Curated annotation (Swiss-Prot):
Its EC number is 2.7.1.170. It is an enzyme of class 2 (transferase). This is Anhydro-N-acetylmuramic acid kinase. SUPFAM superfamilies: Actin-like ATPase domain. One of its GO terms (biological process) is amino sugar metabolic process. GO terms for molecular function: ATP binding; kinase activity; phosphotransferase activity, alcohol group as acceptor. ATP binds at residues 11-18. Belongs to the anhydro-N-acetylmuramic acid kinase family. It comes from the Bacteria. Keywords: ATP-binding, Carbohydrate metabolism, Kinase, Nucleotide-binding, Transferase. Catalyzes the specific phosphorylation of 1,6-anhydro-N-acetylmuramic acid (anhMurNAc) with the simultaneous cleavage of the 1,6-anhydro ring, generating MurNAc-6-P. Is required for the utilization of anhMurNAc either imported from the medium or derived from its own cell wall murein, and thus plays a role in cell wall recycling. InterPro entries: Anhydro_N_Ac-Mur_kinase, ATPase_NBD.
Length: 376
């Protein structure tokens, strides 16, 4: 019978947990599910991702709470879709990243795999990032290897753009498996969602309508772009440690205190939102235009794929070199499920004892088998 792998993903946006049951060769999605975080768990996880003095007790409590939610979700996925547990070979659980510091050689994801295995009776592959980091890599992004396996084309250059909390690109040169590379370009939903929730009470800016109502603030944009991450050369990765509301508030305060740059008429929440959106699209454009790919196709996944204003702005920015911008749904995989499917694929690679990182992407010393197993 066809082997099925379950992928579980919680990203920097922290809007919930995505579950995918998939088989490969060829890719087939058997079932999907999303479970939202309980507000208390989300608050705990959010607090743990921000720099500061975080209690070990808080981390332990969140580690257990998230694992129980994941275990419950997997059982629900299996039962609601009448999947046969005997053909499910493994679960690939990314966990929630609460700290990612490649410059210091460490990354930490929580969501106890032992609890998940105990609740489901299925082996869990977890802790995917640290082996790459031990080999000198960034430990991220890991999904470009999956993008290469599923989306690379023999005659057309493609870019897979993931718009989660952080934006990252996988650059797939036509017919050149050895030429694949990718990296984080900077914040995507992580700042826009937080700013939107603060001022509107909504968890995200639906279709980018609020940002579309505003106008980017040039002086503020220049301050935001001065963050050292944007001047780094790949391989590079980032997260909530670098881009968060505290950082944004600091930049806003500096701008407001600059008598030469500050204009009170520009200082509206919707203009700040428009500025954050432009920060995202400008970094993506820079990443694509500085690549060796002259023209081709951009396919977008992640929550940002549903931000129609962002995609319109991106099409406009990439018009010069005739890049098309579409959802990965055109390629047969919904943008909602790409990352969770990638971790099902990573679980399969581990079970087959095959490498899953791309040194050209992460900067690792070589190809490595990623993850550790918690057996039944």
């Amino acid at each position: 019978m066809t082997a099925i792998y379950i992928g579980v993903m919680t990203g920097t946006s922290m809007d919930g947990v995505d579950f995918v049951a998939a088989s490969f060769d060829p890719l087939h999605i058997h079932a999907t599910l999303t479970l939202p975080f309980e507000p208390a768990l989300r608050d705990e996880l959010m607090a743990l991702t921000l720099p500061g003095d975080n209690e070990i007790d808080r981390m332990g409590k969140a580690d257990v709470g998230l694992a129980k939610l994941i275990g419950h979700g997997i059982n629900m996925l299996i039962e609601q879709n009448h999947l046969d547990r005997h053909v499910i070979k493994a679960i690939g659980s990314h966990g929630q990243t609460i700290r990612h510091r490649p410059e210091h050689g460490f990354t930490l994801q929580i969501g106890d795999p032992h609890i998940i295995t105990e609740l489901t009776g299925i082996p869990v592959i977890s802790d995917f990032r640290r082996r790459d980091m031990a080999a000198g890599g960034q430990g991220a992004p890991l999904v470009p290897a999956f993008h290469q396996a599923i989306f690379q084309h023999s005659t057309i250059h493609r870019v897979i753009l993931n718009l989660g909390g952080i934006a990252n690109v996988s650059l797939l040169p036509a017919g050149n498996p050895d030429g694949v590379y990718g990296f984080d370009t900077g914040p995507a939903n992580i700042l826009m969602d937080a700013w939107c929730e603060r001022y509107t009470g909504h968890p995200y800016d639906e279709n980018g309508n609020w940002a579309a109502y505003g106008q980017p603030i040039r002086a503020l944009l220049e301050r935001l772009q001065a963050h050292e991450f944007f001047s780094k050369k790949p391989p590079k990765s980032t997260g909530r440690e670098d881009f968060n509301l505290d950082w944004l508030d600091d930049q806003l305060a500096d701008w407001r205190n600059d008598e030469l740059e500050y204009d009170e008429l520009e200082d509206t929440p919707e203009n700040v939102q428009a500025t954050l959106l432009k920060l995202t699209t400008r970094a993506i454009k820079k990443a694509i235009y500085r690549s060796e790919l002259d023209t081709g196709e951009v396919y977008v996944c992640g929550g940002g794929a549903y931000n129609s204003h962002l995609l319109e702005q991106l099409r406009w920015r990439l018009r010069k070199h005739h890049w098309s911008v579409q959802s990965t749904s055109v390629l047969g995989l919904s943008p909602t499920w790409v990352e969770a499917t990638a971790f099902a694929w990573l679980a399969m690679r581990f079970m087959q004892q095959q490498s899953a990182n791309l040194p050209s992407v992460t900067g690792a010393a070589g190809f490595r088998i990623l993850g550790t197993i918690t057996s039944v």
